[in-house]
Every structure is written in structure tokens, then in C-alpha cells.
């Protein structure tokens, strides 16, 4: 008898359960084969970002199987076998590891096959209400559905989700199939034909669970032919109280995402460019916050320049400090000064035993020979205290000259500011007379000092800006106003945004009276893509799917290539191509659309003019082709 450990443990059963990744893979293959390859005019959104379409699945083969096996014979099991016998589907089925996963895939594929049965009350279509330029899948009713009736074949498969999977789907913006179970209080992911049902604040259907992994849509009110089947995603799914909802109910009520955005005067003033007034804006406001703080904390009366200057980089110039210290070490006691200097400018001079007279312009000892250094500084007069402390520390280790007697050195170091605005000049004159009092260094130190001063004159370096004193720019309002995407009810129909080519135009469908964009409309199509696809698959005009009783003598068209899909020349001549069907101003919604202009009595007085125009266009097209 096998032990309990040898039996199937819950971990093994959990490992074999249906997961989100497996179900997403099944759904991508099923929608690619049975929706996108069934004469569909666009591609549905896939769950995997890098999905590659299955090779070996051809559109004509899929349509033939659906027509003969599903629509006419009503044998979905035989259609399933023929579909799985195709080379692309056979390869995918062979890659599945075990029989259990193969059964899961067949079960999920069967849901998409059954929605093509003639008794199915819905079909997949598209809408551009939400994004204007891109068509999203939707569910449209082609039969009348009573209130409380379970919508046949509009079902899906549920699979529980983990927190990591939910966050990943949120980042990929593929979270439109997440539902919250009211019984389990956990999020689940559902896929299948029901995933194409969009949200509406006044939905005509609701999602109900069937078993542990099934989900069905039940009609909450009567649904008429041509009406979109919708469900409710939640009260706060599109923001708080669905404030960003773009459903049809909100469009008719002009609320939430369709509400007009009225900009206040404050908002418009913030969006506009501020007017710079020299009297209203002080110079301190043009400086960085660190510099402004330094001015407020210091006791000096130094005012910044009247014109704002660009702040250059600050670099440590050790040679300047070394020369200043070496000249100040042998200076005797000097006379007092009437104007005490600011602390920010005298911090570069080390303390001496004597009381030297220090001013903002000159430093004058008592008597003797003079050393004058006149320098026009291009740097800011308010240097950072932390940098000054660093430089003071380095200057304490520098050597002093041994003997300097009756030496007069005059070096003028003028640094021309390369910036757009001139900098204020600060003159520092050092007049030093002293006697040789220390013989610790050789007399060649004078030449070293001169060479260092010449290096300062010849190679002026831009001050290097430290990381701490980085210029922090304030937030400057933009010159252009922010372009808020304001939606207007009906702005997704008869708009010029979808007319990319010269011969693209809006055309009115002769079957369902819905406006659609026809690309390269050299000849006008009679039906919209939905009605034309329905006719190609079922052989009848939309929404008819089968004969309506024994008295119906209309024959099904088994070969769609025998049907003429364009207007006849006499019908083409009555169509107005003015403005390519674009309506300016507020475009009405499809339900409240204006009457068709492509009728027999429209522009009857201009038949001859339209006929000539059509002949001219035809002749020019023939010449270009």
C-alpha cells in the first residue's frame, strides 16, 4: 500500500490547476484563429504583449469551416476537429505538456466556435468611442433579448489571480478583464467571448458565475437589435465615481469623461507666460535659493549687482591663497580702518599678530615696500563659507617666504567675464613692507611666488560649483497652454482625425445606417465592415443568420465573391463627396445621427454636375493607373 506521501498531494493538484498564464495563452490563440482570421477588419487586443500570430491558419479555411460546419450544419464538434487539424493549431496543441491542458484549450476554443452558431444572439464588433483613433472590440446584439434572459454563448472562464499578477496587469494596462467576486472577495481574471463586453454606467447586462470557473452574462433589461451589450465593471473602476467614464450613458448625459472642462481665471493665468517686470521682481528672486539664504543670514550690507548674472563654476585656486598667506605672514602691525569689511570677503586672509587695516578695496600695512595686487573678480562676491573654510585649511600648510626686502611687485590680473553681463570688480591692493625675519626657506621662494601669480594671470579658471550649492531653478510656467484632451459627445464619428489618406472619407452604411470610414474610396462600398463581414460569413444581410421559417424562400449565398460590394454607377453619381463626409462642430452620436444624404432624392437638382464630376474623377484615375 503506498504511503500518504506517495499520494497526490495538494501541491501537485495546485500545480496542475488552470493559471492565468495558461488561460491567457489559450485565449490569444483562440481569438487569433476565430476572430482575427474570420474576415475581421482589425486585430483584437491580446493578453500577451509580444504575441506572435500562429502560422498555418488561413482566413479562407477558417471561414469555410465556420460556414459549412457551424452555420449550415450546426455541428460545432466537427468544426472543432477541423480547426485543430490545421497545421498551426496542430503544432500549438502538440506543444501543450499533458492531456489536461489540451482539454482546457479545447474547452476554451469551443466557446469561440459556438458564438458563430445561427441561434447566437450577438456578434463581435468594434467601437472607437474610447480612443477615437483605435477600434476596441465590443459586443453587439443581432437578436432581441428579453429582460432576465441568459445571453446564450456569451460566457467566459474565470481564473483566480495573485497580487503580483494583478500588479503586472495593471502596469501593462490590460486590467479590463479583472472582476471582483462578491462571494470570494478576491480578484479573478475572466477570458472568453464575454471579455469583449464593455462597461456602461447603465448596463443592460450583468456578470454571474456558473460553477467554479464559469461566467455568464444575463440581460438586466430588454436589449434590441443593434444595441451594444454592456456590463458594469464597478462604481470606481474609472476613477472615483467613474469620473473618467466614456460610456454611451455618460455621453448622452454629458457627464464624467464627457463633461466640459471649464478653465478658471486662475488656471488660465497660470498657464500663460508671466510678464517680467523689473520693478516688481527683485534681483534676489533671480538668484538661487542658497545664495538668497546666504544674503539674509549674513550681516554684510553687500547688495547684488543690478543686473542678474549667470553663475559660473567654482574651482579652488590654491595658488591665490598661498600667495596671500605668504605675503601676510611677514606683514607688521598696521593702522586701523574706518570701514570694517564683511566677513565673507575677509575670510580669505589669515589672522596675523598685528592689527592690519583692512577695507573693501585695500589692505594697507604701516610702512615699507608695497606689493599691490589688483584683480577684477568675475566670480560671485558671496562665496560659500564651507568652501572658504576648506581653502583656509589648505593655506595653513603653505610655506612663507624667508626674506623679502624693499620689493615692489605689481601684478594686475584682470579676468574678463565671458558671460553676457559684466561682473562688479573688487580691487584688493596689498602694500607690504617688512624686514627679513625668518631664514627657514631659500631665497628662491620669490621666483616661485611670481610664477604662481603669473599662472593666475595667464590661466584664469572658472569657479567650480560644488554639489551642495547646485543652482535650483524654480518652476517656470510654460509658454504654451497645456493641451487637455477634452472629449465632446460624438467626436469619434464623422471626424477628420481618421481621414489619413487623400481618398479616405466617411460613408453611410446602406444596411444599418451607421457612418464608417472607407479607406481609398475610389468606389463607394455599400455596407460597413460589420455588415459586410456578416454577409460573407452567413450569406444573408445583417442581422439575418438563418431562414425564418418554411415560407422564407431567400437563398443563402455560399460564395461571398459573387456578391457585388460596391454601389452601382447611378448610385455613385448621387453621392456628395463634399468635405469627405466630415461634419464640423459638434458631431451627433450614431443613435441621433442626421438622416442619410445618400438617398435617391438627395441633390436631385445637381445630378448632371455630380455625374460630370464622377466621370472626371474616373478619367483622372484611369490616367494615373
Curated annotation (Swiss-Prot):
Molecular-function annotations in GO: histone H4K20 trimethyltransferase activity
Keyword annotations of the record: Chromatin regulator, Chromosome, Methyltransferase, Nucleus, S-adenosyl-L-methionine, Transferase
GO cellular component terms attached to this protein's record: chromosome; nucleus
Start and end residues of each stretch annotated as Disordered: 260-348, 368-405, 432-451, 457-476, 582-625
Compositional bias ranges of the Basic and acidic residues kind: 593-610
Record GO biological process: methylation
Span of domain SET: 120-234
Any single Pfam family the record assigns to this protein: SET
Compositionally biased residues, Basic residues: 462-473, 611-625
Reaction catalysis annotation: L-lysyl(20)-[histone H4] + 3 S-adenosyl-L-methionine = N(6),N(6),N(6)-trimethyl-L-lysyl(20)-[histone H4] + 3 S-adenosyl-L-homocysteine + 3 H(+)
Gene3D superfamilies linked to this entry: Histone-lysine N-methyltransferase, SET domain
Family indicated by similarity: Belongs to the class V-like SAM-binding methyltransferase superfamily. Histone-lysine methyltransferase family. Suvar4-20 subfamily.
Organism: Aspergillus oryzae (strain ATCC 42149 / RIB 40) (Yellow koji mold)
Major subcellular location class: nucleus
Domain of life: Eukaryota
Biased composition annotated in UniProt, kind: Polar residues: 269-286, 372-386
Name of the protein: Histone-lysine N-methyltransferase set9
InterPro entries to which the protein is assigned, alphabetical: Hist-Lys_N-MTase_N (IPR041938), Set9_fungi (IPR025783), SET_dom (IPR001214), SET_dom_sf (IPR046341), Suv4-20/Set9 (IPR039977)
Annotated PANTHER family: HISTONE-LYSINE N-METHYLTRANSFERASE KMT5B (PTHR12977:SF4), SUPPRESSOR OF VARIEGATION 4-20-RELATED (PTHR12977)
SMART domains referenced in this protein's UniProt entry, alphabetically: SET
Function (record text): Histone methyltransferase that trimethylates 'Lys-20' of histone H4 to form H4K20me3.
Enzyme Commission designation: 2.1.1.372
RNA-binding is among the record's keywords: no
Top class in the EC scheme: transferase
PROSITE patterns assigned: SAM_MT43_SUVAR420_1, SET
Compartment(s) of residence: Nucleus; Chromosome
Ranges in coiled-coil conformation: none
Amino acid at each position: 500500500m503506498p504511503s500518504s506521501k506517495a499520494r497526490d498531494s495538494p501541491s501537485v493538484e495546485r500545480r496542475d490547476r488552470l493559471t492565468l498564464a495558461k488561460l491567457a495563452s489559450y485565449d490569444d490563440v483562440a481569438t487569433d484563429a476565430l476572430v482575427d482570421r474570420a474576415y475581421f477588419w482589425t486585430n483584437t487586443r491580446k493578453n500577451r504583449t509580444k504575441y506572435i500570430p500562429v502560422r498555418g491558419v488561413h482566413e479562407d479555411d477558417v471561414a469555410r469551416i465556420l460556414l459549412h460546419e457551424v452555420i449550415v450544419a450546426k455541428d460545432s464538434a466537427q468544426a472543432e476537429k477541423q480547426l485543430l487539424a490545421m497545421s498551426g493549431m496542430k503544432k500549438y496543441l502538440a506543444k501543450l505538456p499533458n492531456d489536461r491542458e489540451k482539454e482546457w484549450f479545447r474547452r476554451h476554443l469551443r466557446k469561440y466556435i459556438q458564438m458563430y452558431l445561427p441561434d447566437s444572439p450577438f456578434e463581435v464588433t468594434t467601437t472607437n468611442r474610447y480612443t477615437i483613433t483605435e477600434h476596441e472590440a465590443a459586443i453587439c446584439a443581432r437578436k432581441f433579448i428579453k429582460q432576465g434572459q441568459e445571453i446564450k454563448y456569451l460566457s467566459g472562464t474565470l481564473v483566480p489571480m495573485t497580487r503580483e499578477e494583478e500588479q503586472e496587469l495593471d502596469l501593462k494596462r490590460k486590467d479590463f478583464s479583472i472582476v471582483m467576486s462578491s462571494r470570494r472577495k478576491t480578484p479573478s481574471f475572466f477570458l472568453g467571448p464575454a471579455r469583449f463586453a464593455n462597461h456602461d454606467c447603465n448596463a443592460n447586462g450583468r456578470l454571474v458565475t456558473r460553477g467554479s470557473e464559469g461566467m455568464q452574462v444575463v440581460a438586466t433589461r430588454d436589449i434590441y437589435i443593434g444595441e451594444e451589450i454592456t456590463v458594469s465593471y464597478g462604481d470606481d473602476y474609472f476613477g472615483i465615481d467613474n469620473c473618467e467614464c466614456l460610456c454611451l450613458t455618460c455621453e448622452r448625459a454629458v457627464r464624467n469623461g464627457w463633461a466640459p472642462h471649464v478653465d478658471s481665471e486662475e488656471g488660465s493665468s497660470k498657464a500663460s507666460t508671466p510678464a517680467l517686470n523689473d520693478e516688481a521682481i527683485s534681483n534676489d528672486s533671480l538668484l538661487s535659493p542658497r545664495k538668497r539664504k546666504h544674503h539674509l543670514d549674513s550681516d554684510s550690507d553687500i547688495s547684488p549687482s543690478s543686473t542678474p548674472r549667470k553663475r559660473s563654476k567654482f574651482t579652488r585656486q590654491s595658488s591665490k591663497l598661498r600667495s596671500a598667506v605668504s605675503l601676510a605672514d611677514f606683514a607688521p602691525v598696521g593702522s586701523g580702518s574706518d570701514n570694517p569689511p564683511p566677513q565673507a570677503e575677509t575670510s580669505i586672509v589669515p589672522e596675523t599678530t598685528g592689527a592690519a587695516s583692512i577695507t573693501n578695496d585695500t589692505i594697507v600695512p604701516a610702512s615699507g615696500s608695497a606689493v599691490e595686487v589688483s584683480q577684477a573678480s568675475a566670480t560671485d562676491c558671496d562665496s560659500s563659507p564651507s568652501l572658504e573654510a576648506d581653502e583656509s585649511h589648505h593655506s595653513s600648510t603653505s610655506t612663507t617666504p624667508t626674506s623679502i626686502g624693499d620689493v615692489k611687485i605689481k601684478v594686475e590680473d584682470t579676468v574678463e567675464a565671458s558671460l553676457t553681463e559684466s561682473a562688479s570688480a573688487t580691487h584688493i591692493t596689498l602694500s607690504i613692507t617688512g624686514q627679513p625675519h625668518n631664514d627657514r626657506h631659500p631665497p628662491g621662494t620669490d621666483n616661485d611666488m611670481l610664477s604662481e601669480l603669473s599662472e593666475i594671470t595667464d590661466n584664469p579658471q572658472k569657479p567650480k560649483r560644488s554639489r551642495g550649492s547646485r543652482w535650483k531653478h524654480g518652476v517656470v510656467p510654460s509658454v504654451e497652454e497645456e493641451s487637455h484632451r477634452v472629449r465632446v459627445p460624438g467626436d469619434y464619428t464623422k471626424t477628420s482625425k481618421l481621414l489619413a489618406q487623400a481618398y479616405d472619407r466617411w460613408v453611410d452604411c446602406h444596411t444599418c445606417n451607421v457612418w464608417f470610414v472607407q479607406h481609398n474610396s475610389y468606389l463607394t462600398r455599400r455596407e460597413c465592415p460589420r455588415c459586410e463581414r456578416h454577409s460573407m460569413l452567413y450569406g444573408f444581410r445583417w442581422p439575418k443568420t438563418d431562414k425564418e421559417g418554411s415560407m422564407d424562400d431567400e437563398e443563402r449565398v455560399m460564395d461571398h465573391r459573387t456578391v457585388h460590394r460596391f454601389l452601382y454607377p447611378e448610385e455613385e453619381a448621387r453621392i456628395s463627396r463634399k468635405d469627405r463626409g466630415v461634419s464640423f462642430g459638434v458631431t451627433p452620436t450614431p443613435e441621433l445621427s442626421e438622416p442619410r444624404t445618400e438617398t435617391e432624392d438627395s441633390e436631385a437638382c445637381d445630378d448632371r454636375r455630380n455625374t460630370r464630376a464622377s466621370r472626371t474623377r474616373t478619367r483622372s484615375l484611369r490616367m494615373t493607373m
